[in-house]
């Protein structure tokens, strides 16, 4: 473990890789050298990052299979991203988590639709009651007995001398 974290060891490995590449490739103008160097750098970085991480994870984890599977999937996804692919490899656990999240969201939306539908039905019933109260109904005879200002008014038969006292009479003004 000390060797993996030692800076001198890392620098010696990089120097060894550079010396090996320069000995293999004698022509300094070779076109593929940057690509080969970047691939080797990525592989070396993955090697340096994944091995200690996997060792620690396997020691501390209860389920080593899931840890190894997760590390391998992460490495494959990293390589796919470096290669320019937009697709990713997923495990069944991730798919199940996404399905659970989708089902939970659908249930939440269905509950909201149910609440909204109930509110809309209540609003429609309220509007119907308001409409029914506002509709004018044709009435043949108007019942004036309920009018409070009609109590003391006498009918034509009850008036003295049969004359309406409220009817205006002719008034002559003097000049």
From Swiss-Prot:
GO BP term, pick one: viral process
Keyword Transmembrane helix found: yes
Entry keyword Calcium: yes
GO molecular function annotation: channel activity; metal ion binding; toxin activity
One GO CC annotation: extracellular region
Glycosylated position list: 8, 18
Lipid bilayer topology: Single-pass type III membrane protein
Cytoplasmic side: 52-175
Swiss-Prot/TrEMBL keywords: Activation of host autophagy by virus, Calcium, Enterotoxin, Glycoprotein, Host endoplasmic reticulum, Host membrane, Host-virus interaction, Ion channel, Ion transport, Membrane, Metal-binding, Secreted, Signal-anchor, Toxin, Transmembrane, Transmembrane helix, Transport, Viral ion channel, Virulence
Mod. after translation: The N-glycosyl content is primarily Man(9)GlcNAc, with a small amount of Man(8)GlcNAc.
TM region positions: 29-51
Binding site for Ca(2+): 120, 123
Role noted for this protein: Plays an essential role in the virus replication cycle by acting as a viroporin. Creates a pore in the host endoplasmic reticulum and as a consequence releases Ca(2+) in the cytoplasm of infected cell. In turn, high levels of cytoplasmic calcium trigger membrane trafficking and transport of viral ER-associated proteins to viroplasms, sites of viral genome replication and immature particle assembly.
Subunit structure: Homotetramer. Interacts with the immature particle in the viroplasm. Interacts with host CAV1, early and late in infection. Interacts with host integrin ITGA1/ITGB1 heterodimer. Interacts with host integrin ITGA2/ITGB1 heterodimer. Interaction with microtubules blocks trafficking to the Golgi apparatus.
Domain notes: Binds 1 calcium ion per tetramer.
Family: Belongs to the rotavirus NSP4 family.
The name this protein goes by in its record: Non-structural glycoprotein 4
Organism: Rotavirus A (strain RVA/Human/United States/D/1974/G1P1A[8])
């Amino acid at each position: 473990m000390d060797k993996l974290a030692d800076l001198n060891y890392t620098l010696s490995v990089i120097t060894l890789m550079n010396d090996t590449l320069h000995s293999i490739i004698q022509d300094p103008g070779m076109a593929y050298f940057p690509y080969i160097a970047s691939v080797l750098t990525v592989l070396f970085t993955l090697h340096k990052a994944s091995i200690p991480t996997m060792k620690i994870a396997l020691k501390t984890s209860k389920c080593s299979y899931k840890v190894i599977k997760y590390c391998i999937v992460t490495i494959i996804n990293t390589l796919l991203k470096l290669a320019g692919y937009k697709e990713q490899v997923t495990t069944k656990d991730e798919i199940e988590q996404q399905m659970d999240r989708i089902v939970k969201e659908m249930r939440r939306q269905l509950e909201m639709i149910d609440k909204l539908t109930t509110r809309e039905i209540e609003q429609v019933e309220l509007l119907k009651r308001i409409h029914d109260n506002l509709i004018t109904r044709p009435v043949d005879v108007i019942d004036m007995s309920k009018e409070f200002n009609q109590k003391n008014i006498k009918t034509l038969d009850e008036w003295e001398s049969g004359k309406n006292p409220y009817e205006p009479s002719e008034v002559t003004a003097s000049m």
